[in-house]
From Swiss-Prot:
Its main location: secreted. Coiled coil: none annotated. This is Dermaseptin-J9. It comes from the Eukaryota. Signal peptide: none annotated. Has antimicrobial activity. GO terms for cellular component: extracellular region. It is found in: Secreted. Expressed by the skin glands. Belongs to the frog skin active peptide (FSAP) family. Dermaseptin subfamily. It comes from Phasmahyla jandaia. Keywords: Amphibian defense peptide, Antibiotic, Antimicrobial, Secreted. GO terms for biological process: defense response to bacterium.
Length: 29
């Protein structure tokens, strides 16, 4: 239902943010 799709979207956003953070760290070193 609503909660499942909401959690899925939050998970996607968190995954993207984590990926971006890792990429930034790699680029900085």
């Amino acid at each position: 239902g609503l909660w499942k799709s909401l959690l899925k979207n939050v998970g996607k956003a968190a995954g993207k943010a984590a990926l971006n953070a890792v990429t930034d760290m790699v680029n900085q070193s």
